[in-house]
From Swiss-Prot:
InterPro entries: DUF1328. Belongs to the UPF0391 family. The lineage of its organism: Archaea, Methanobacteriati, Methanobacteriota, Stenosarchaea group, Methanomicrobia. Keywords: Cell membrane, Membrane, Transmembrane, Transmembrane helix. One of its GO terms (cellular component) is plasma membrane. It comes from Methanoculleus marisnigri (strain ATCC 35101 / DSM 1498 / JR1). Signal peptide: none annotated. Its main location: membrane. This is UPF0391 membrane protein Memar_0049. It comes from the Archaea. It is found in: Cell membrane.
Length: 53
């Protein structure tokens, strides 16, 4: 997988969103961007928590 873990999934969903946006599937692109955004937020929160512990 691309980078593994949450970052890899976020990158995957971001790329899917770009592809679907180019193809004109706005609903799928928006959903993919939403998933990618939440994965990045979760990754950042977990990274901060792991740095503090």
């Amino acid at each position: 997988m691309l980078g593994g873990g949450l970052v890899g999934l976020a990158i995957l969903f971001f790329v899917l969103a770009l592809i679907f946006a180019i193809l004109g599937a706005r609903g799928v692109a928006g959903m993919s961007m939403s998933v990618a955004k939440w994965l990045v937020i979760i990754f950042i929160v977990l990274a901060i928590i792991s740095l503090l512990l």
